[in-house]
Amino acid sequence: MANSLILGSPINPEGEMMIQFSNNHDNNIEFQRRKKMKKNNPETETDSSSDLSCFVAQTGALLHLPQGFTSSNGSNRECRKSPRPIISSYSSSEKQFVTFTLAPVDGRHCRLRLPMQFTRENGINKPGKIYLVGKDGSKWLANLLLENNRGRMTLGDGWKSFVKANGLKTGDTYTFKLLWEDTTPVLSLCFEEYNTDTRVGEESSKESLPAEPSSQEKIVKDDNNKDESSTWKREGNHLRCKDSTSPSQNCTLTVTITPDSLEHGRLRLPLQFMTENSMNKPGEITLLGTDGAKWMASLLLEKKGRMSLGKGWKDFAKANGLKTGDSITLEPIWEDRTPVLSIKSSSGKGQSEFSKESLSIKPSSGNMTKKVENNREASRKYPPRSRESSSAIQNQFMALTPLRDIVSQVAHDLSIGEVINFRHKGDNMLRVSDLGSNCCGVQDLLAPSSNYDHDNISNISMKINPHIRKEAVTFSSYDGYAHDNFEPPSKKKVKKNNPEMEADYLSDHSCFVSHVTTSSLHTNALSLEVKESLPIEPSIKPNISEDDNNKEEDIIEENSSFEREKNHWICIDSISSSQNRFLTLTITPDSLKHGRLRLPLQFMIENSMNKPGEITVLGKDGAKWLVSLLLERRGRMSLDASSGQETREAEKNREESSSLWELEKRTYCPRKRDSSSDVKNRFLTLTLAPEDVKDGNLHLPCQFMRINGINKPGQITLLGRGGMKWFAYLLSGDGTVVVGNGWKGFCEANGVMLGETFVLEFIPKDDTNHVFKFYTK
């Protein structure tokens, strides 16, 4: 029969619940084994039930605690298993840091697994080498391996040596910081005082704290309703002001440039940052550089829900001098409904220094982007003209190749067909103007129509306001002067052949017109016209009187000479063709084996040789060879050497050929010979080598084969003493002859031993069988 026990639960000062065993007598604390217990005493049960700190239980194999007892004393927590120890942790807010707890397996197997989220967001997805930097700054080279099963990156050889050298112990927690050296990742061990628990503590502080044990049981329902209603109002107000508060709380984002982001043109952005700033929808986004220039980029949504910058990001990074390993701080800005990411600061070796005098564009104005795009679209409407050659004007041009740091400051985004204006400012400085406020007059030509040839393409010439400040060169579309008074040019009818306008325009030597061509963009060089009346010297500056300035400000001309513009086009094309006349190629084994020489398509297009047909190749000795020019499937051009023949007519008229290719270097092959040279070139001296006898081969020099016109494989005849004949086979044009077995006996029969020399005389025959006479020296 089960006994009844009264259990009490006093709480100790430490907050732990203690269970005391007691019978009905208050003085007897110890349990008496052979003492009979009172059965079913209703008074005792009533007294104990009124006191919530004790209860009556039946003694059995298991002791069950009443639910009311546990809930009233705050002991209603469930018992759970202890959580698994964290081996590695990673926080997306600081993706440069990763925390490891060194496990015994890591040291035993000499491997350390990296978190997949850490490697993906930092672009570490390829096996290779990685540097490990210790506390003292020493570097250790380790292998970065890729597991085939799950795509996880691990540290291989070199990790165990790093652990021993830095005294890392099993069970301790260490934090590493990711750095980059060019394209090689670097994991730097942080000092002991750097505690990553501060980052984890912020996240854990968001969790609700457990309620302290309380002895209160009664809670008024009205108070609960009031709390719930106040909570609902507070949540509603939070949702209303979420859009206004989130940008201020998450106003900046620090991103590290990885090699993959520049190679593939993708920059991944944290989804939490983009969501809180309402930029989590794909579309277009504006990137604002440190110089104020705006770049349009694509905002993409990847399969896993992450946001990334796509097309336009790579050009933006190059223009702002961003390199691998640089850290940039981005600030989200909204212009109407267009999202904008502005670079607040950048740090690293790739940081570029921009000019202090470059004018910045306000984020609220999009005039620059719109006007440049309109000019670009208008210029693309006109087809490119055909090239004409004019060698007499080639010396009137010079090539200007801007430096890389200057090009990065240009915000014009020039394209083929656009017109830019330069001004000489003294000290060899040139100024770019793209329909800016410095232009006091714009002159247009008629657009191409059916009555005109493609040579009459519309061109835009600009005249510079003489009141331009004399400062350092700046590349910008706006100079800040009279911006409100400037109006874009309108299309008006043009009067032809206005001599007054020509004289006025040509008299101002401080400006000229240049046209952007295909070759100028490919070669990164722009051809500028140099007139004799404008010597560029550091000491010369344009002297313009006040009367001339007033006249130029008041007069706005709209006409231009059609013939002068046509001659300008001819000059531009002649200099571009002279710049791309040379091509350097490397002879590959495949080109000689298959008889095909591939030529760059860009070079062929710029020289108008992109159509299949025949082409003449001019040798160094003046000999001309007719070769087939082929067009492959992928659009590449190639030379077919199998059809190359020497043309007699081309040899007579060397200067009349339309397309000639001159070879700078080739083997000497005389084509015009007298009788004495003919006889001399028919003899060949060779040495009988052991390997030739063993392999049964005979190698004839390539030059000897070419001079005597032996270019076809077939059977040849060797004539020895007393009319002895030996038949051999010529395999290819490189001079390899298979003489077969018995070649040693043939040489000994003619008095030639191993290591001795002999002479072969080529006897020309009308038939295809070549004959060589064998002599001893």
Curated annotation (Swiss-Prot):
Classification via InterPro entries: B3_DNA-bd (IPR003340), DNA-bd_pseudobarrel_sf (IPR015300), REM_fam (IPR039218)
GO function term, MF aspect, one: DNA binding
One cellular component term from this protein's GO annotations in UniProt: nucleus
Residue span of region Disordered: 200-248, 344-391
Ranges of the DNA-binding region feature: 97-193, 252-347, 582-676, 683-777
Key words, A-Z: DNA-binding, Nucleus, Repeat, Transcription, Transcription regulation
Protein name, UniProt field: B3 domain-containing protein REM-like 1
Localization in the cell: Nucleus
One Pfam family from the record: B3
Domain of life: Eukaryota
Lineage of origin: Eukaryota, Viridiplantae, Streptophyta, Embryophyta, Tracheophyta
Organism per entry: Arabidopsis thaliana (Mouse-ear cress)
Composition bias type Basic and acidic residues, residue spans: 218-243, 370-388
